[in-house]
């Protein structure tokens, strides 16, 4: 690993920790391709380049270090921000993307296959400016950067909150916090106090924010980017529809047609995954707790079952829920020989991976493992239960990430430039900005929008140029 310091003795930038800086040229070439596929993000970069609304922003970023994220990072920098970045998943980094960002002089701490100890070390590093200052904004995916400051601040007052880890992830998180508390007492509360706000990318991270706010523990305002329509209805559905199959195919080379595929959860992500499997002619079954989502699945022609029913009958299992222990040890013991098990929700605890540690693991290739049970039956676990589309492939296509990252950029501008507008709480981007992102994305698709006449706008009671739907409208 390349060890990070602010500058080496020759004055060369080296404030990064990545796999291989020599991959930078490759990463830059892929970024050039991605640029043409990210019209919304590029249009926002062009619109705000002259005014640089993020001048003075210091953004601590925790989001998958991919080629598309590299385009987001450079957009934030072009708009005036200083940025330090880490990946929000130990397997999701594209090493050539990280190298391209490091070569551009932007601090980045990420490589594919980090240990959990390194993961939390890198998350700490995004908060450490070399002039001794702190960030004033967070851009988060899954909520780990936000969690770190909140849990660390709590531990400063009551060390018992990090005394009893319940899983391997918490063991390393708690250990990293204890280390920081010993080295720099008061660091967490000082750092949290400087944060103007956080913008959150995912369903899982948004749930964390709402939970903290309901308990009165949220320390700074947050914008829920995930539930912007041009994020959740596009990234979550259409992104997963393409990247799930990409991950499974790269990992296993399995023929999907004719297989029984179980999609655990039928939210936006589950809907996209079910469409993907159906498109390749799998028999798609869905598990759901919510009767409304279950009814939607049934009306789309999917069979709605329970995991207990499906465990010994299906060939491919995909968790999409954001919940814990959706696929349990007992479910996996019941599965067929060579059943494929994977997750496309944010954390690895949707599958009870910890219970599999008692068995023999045979690594087939990176992020593909055979779990060998005592009766010699094997199941194929992808990405150790972490995000299959990023662990075994390269994540969502650039075009759909343009929409998501356009929202992230606008949310960062909104929070940073209007601090008095947002007391502590969780907010949505205005509908006008949601529609703006959609307009920008449409330009490269050859789409022609119909325009309301004055008479039509008056008749349905909406502004002629939008927004066209109420806040509670369900697209």
Curated annotation (Swiss-Prot):
Its main location: cytoplasm. Binds 1 NAD(+) per subunit. The gene is ahcY. Pfam families: AdoHcyase (PF05221), AdoHcyase_NAD (PF00670). Belongs to the adenosylhomocysteinase family. It is found in: Cytoplasm. May play a key role in the regulation of the intracellular concentration of adenosylhomocysteine. It catalyses: S-adenosyl-L-homocysteine + H2O = L-homocysteine + adenosine. NAD(+) binds at residues 202-204, 236, 265-270, 288, 323, 344-346, 389. It comes from the Bacteria. One of its GO terms (cellular component) is cytosol. One of its GO terms (biological process) is L-homocysteine biosynthetic process. Keywords: Cytoplasm, Hydrolase, NAD, One-carbon metabolism. Substrate binds at residues 66, 141, 201, 231, 235. Its EC number is 3.13.2.1. InterPro entries: Adenosylhomocyst_ase-like_sf, Adenosylhomocysteinase-like, Ado_hCys_hydrolase_NAD-bd, NAD(P)-bd_dom_sf, S-Ado-L-homoCys_hydrolase_CS. CDD domains: SAHH. Its cofactor is NAD(+). Pathway: Amino-acid biosynthesis; L-homocysteine biosynthesis; L-homocysteine from S-adenosyl-L-homocysteine: step 1/1. This is Adenosylhomocysteinase. GO terms for molecular function: adenosylhomocysteinase activity. It comes from Geobacter sulfurreducens (strain ATCC 51573 / DSM 12127 / PCA).
């Amino acid at each position: 690993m390349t060890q990070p310091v602010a500058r080496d003795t020759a004055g060369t930038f080296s404030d990064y920790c990545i796999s291989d800086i020599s991959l930078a040229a490759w990463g830059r070439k892929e970024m050039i391709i991605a640029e043409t596929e990210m019209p919304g993000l590029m249009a926002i970069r062009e619109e705000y380049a002259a005014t640089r609304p993020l001048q003075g922003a210091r953004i601590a970023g925790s989001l998958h270090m991919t080629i598309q994220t590299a385009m987001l990072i450079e957009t934030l920098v072009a708009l005036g921000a200083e940025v330090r970045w880490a990946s929000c998943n130990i397997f999701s980094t594209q090493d050539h993307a990280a190298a391209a960002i490091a070569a551009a002089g932007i601090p980045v701490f990420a490589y594919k296959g980090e240990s959990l100890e390194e993961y939390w070390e890198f998350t700490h590093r995004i908060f450490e400016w070399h002039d001794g200052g702190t960030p004033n904004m967070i851009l988060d995916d899954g909520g780990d950067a936000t969690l770190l400051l909140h849990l660390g601040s709590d531990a400063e007052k009551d060390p018992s909150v990090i005394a009893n880890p319940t899983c391997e992830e918490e063991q390393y998180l708690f250990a990293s916090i204890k280390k920081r508390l010993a080295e720099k007492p008061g660091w967490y509360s000082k750092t949290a106090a400087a944060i103007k706000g956080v913008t959150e990318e995912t369903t899982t991270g948004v749930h964390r924010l709402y939970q903290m706010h309901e308990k009165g523990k949220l320390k700074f305002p947050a914008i829920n980017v995930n539930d912007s329509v041009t994020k959740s209805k596009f990234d979550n559905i259409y992104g997963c529809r393409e990247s799930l199959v990409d991950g499974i195919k790269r990992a296993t080379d399995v023929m999907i047609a004719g297989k029984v595929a179980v999609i655990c959860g039928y939210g936006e992500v589950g809907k996209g995954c079910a469409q993907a499997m159906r498109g390749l002619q799998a028999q798609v079954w869905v598990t759901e707790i919510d009767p409304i989502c279950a009814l939607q699945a049934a009306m789309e022609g999917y069979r709605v079952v329970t995991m207990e029913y499906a465990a010994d009958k299906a060939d491919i299992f995909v968790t999409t829920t954001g919940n814990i222990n959706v696929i349990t040890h007992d479910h996996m013991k019941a599965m067929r020989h060579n059943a494929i098990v994977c997750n496309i929700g944010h954390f690895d605890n949707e599958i009870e991976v910890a219970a599999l540690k008692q068995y023999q693991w045979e690594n087939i290739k990176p992020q593909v493992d055979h779990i060998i049970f005592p009766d010699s039956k094997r199941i194929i676990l992808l990405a150790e239960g972490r995000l299959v589309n990023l662990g075994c492939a390269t994540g969502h296509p650039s075009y759909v990430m343009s929409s998501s990252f356009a929202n992230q950029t606008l949310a960062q501008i909104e929070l940073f430039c209007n601090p008095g507008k947002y007391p502590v709480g969780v907010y949505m981007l205005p509908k006008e900005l949601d529609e703006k992102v959609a307009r920008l994305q449409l330009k490269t698709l050859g789409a022609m929008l119909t325009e309301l006449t004055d008479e039509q706008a008056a008749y349905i009671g909406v502004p002629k140029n939008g927004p066209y739907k109420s806040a509670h409208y369900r697209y």
